[in-house]
Amino acid sequence: MLFVSCPRIIFNAHPALRIKGKPVQGQTVKALLSVSLREVQDVEYLFCKTQTCPVVYFSPDSEQTFTVEHVRERVYQKEPDGDDVFVCYCFRHKGEDIRAASSETVTAIVDDINTGINAGQCACDLRNPQGSCCLGNVRALIKRISTATAVLESPR
């Protein structure tokens, strides 16, 4: 996987790209990091969704930065085309599950996720590196696959 380099700079945004990160709860960071929790300061953390950057979590002052190597799970936003990367962390649906599925099976996957959410069985704040529900990622992947399929199937 190719990443851009991320030099440390002090800026109230992503340390390398100078874009705003998505705020995540401290419990998300603590649950998903593979480092000793002694290394995790009690500060605000932001999530970097930029695919070409190895940084996953960073503090606004860039004093704390954690990369893909520090996270227990592979991060979908960093590897959106990875077949064996989870798109849904709570109910364990991978990109390959969705890419290989028929339209009926895709509907069943979305229904499975919705059923789990409605039953209170999801823990996106602890299991998903972005710290929030995966359903948007799942639907975006389905749309991307559907669009790519339509382009491939259109007459030229």
What are these regions (language model features)?
Residues 15-40, 105:
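Short recognition patches in nucleic-acid-associated and regulatory proteins
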Residues 17-24, 52-60, 94:
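Cys/His-rich microdomains that often coordinate metals
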Residues 65-95:
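Extended interfacial segments that mediate partner engagement and assembly in macromolecular machines
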Residues 115-156:
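Long, compositionally biased
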Residues 3-8, 39-47, 77-84, 106-126:
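Immediate flanking context of iron-sulfur cluster ligation sites
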Residues 1-3, 25-36, 68-73:
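Short Cys/His-rich Zn2+-coordinating modules
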Residues 41-66:
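Short metal-binding segments enriched for Cys and/or His
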Residues 10-17, 48-50, 88:
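Short cysteine-rich clusters marking metal-coordination/redox-active sites
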